[in-house]
C-alpha cells in the first residue's frame, strides 16, 4: 500500500509515479516501494543500521516516499548491492514514459568539512563515474567499499548516467552521508515535472 502523503503545497503531485519491486534470490529477499512525488517519508529495515540511516536520508532530502525491507541472511554485501538493484528498478518503473521530466539534475552538497558533487542524466544509458575515498574500511557494520557498488547498481538498473565526486573531505561518515544526500537532491531535480517540456526531453524521440 502507498504511504499516505501529507499535504505539500510546494510540490506538484503526479498521479501514479510510484512502483513496488521485489527481488528474491537464494542470497537476498528485497522489497522496495518508491514514490517520486512524496514528502520524504521512509520506512526502512535492511538489518544494517548505518545503511538504513543513509536510505532514510535519501528519502528525506529527495522528498521521496520509500519503503525498504531486506535481510542479511547471507551477508551485508549482497543486501546492499541488491537493494541498489531493486531501488534502481523502482525508480525506473515509477518514472514510466519520462514525459515532461527535467531529465538532468545536480547538487553540490556540504557537510561539515566535506563537499560532494552529484550530477544525473536520466538518459536511459547507464554509466557511473565515482570518485571518492574513505579512511576507514567500515562505518558501523557498513563496508565503505559498498558505497560505489550501491550506486553502480542503481545507475545500471535505473538506466541513469550518474556522477558522484568527493570534492574534499576527511570523515568517512560525512562523506558517505553527503553522497546519499547529494544523490537525493539531484534525483529530485531530474525527476520533477516541467510543464514547459512537451513529450520527452530529448531530440531523439526516446529515452
Predicted regions, residues:
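Intrinsic-disorder-associated, low-complexity terminal segments enriched in Asp/Asn/His/Tyr and depleted
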Residues: 8-10
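N-terminal intrinsically disordered, cationic/polar leader segments
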Residues: 14-207
Amino acid at each position: 500500500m502507498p504511504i499516505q502523503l501529507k499535504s505539500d503545497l510546494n510540490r506538484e503531485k503526479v498521479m501514479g509515479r510510484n512502483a513496488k519491486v521485489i527481488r528474491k534470490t537464494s542470497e537476498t529477499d528485497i522489497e522496495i516501494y518508491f514514490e517520486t512525488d512524496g514528502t520524504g517519508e521512509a520506512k526502512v529495515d535492511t538489518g544494517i543500521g548505518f545503511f538504513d540511516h543513509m536510505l532514510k536520508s535519501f528519502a528525506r532530502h529527495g522528498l521521496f516516499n520509500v519503503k525498504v525491507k531486506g535481510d542479511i541472511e547471507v551477508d551485508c554485501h549482497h543486501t546492499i548491492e541488491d537493494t541498489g538493484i531493486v531501488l534502481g528498478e523502482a525508480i525506473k518503473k515509477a518514472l514510466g514514459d519520462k514525459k515532461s521530466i527535467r531529465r538532468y539534475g545536480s547538487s553540490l552538497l556540504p557537510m561539515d568539512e566535506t563537499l560532494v558533487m552529484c550530477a544525473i542524466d536520466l538518459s536511459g544509458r547507464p554509466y557511473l563515474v565515482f570518485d571518492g575515498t574513505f579512511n576507514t574500511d567500515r562505518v558501523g557494520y557498513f563496508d565503505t567499499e559498498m558505497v560505489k557498488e550501491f550506486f553502480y547498481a542503481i545507475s545500471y538498473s535505473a538506466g541513469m548516467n550518474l556522477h558522484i565526486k568527493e570534492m574534499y573531505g576527511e570523515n568517512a561518515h560525512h562523506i558517505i552521508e553527503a553522497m546519499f544526500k547529494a544523490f537525493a537532491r539531484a534525483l529530485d531535480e531530474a525527476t520533477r515535472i516541467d510543464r514547459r517540456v512537451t513529450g520527452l526531453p530529448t531530440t531523439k524521440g526516446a529515452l
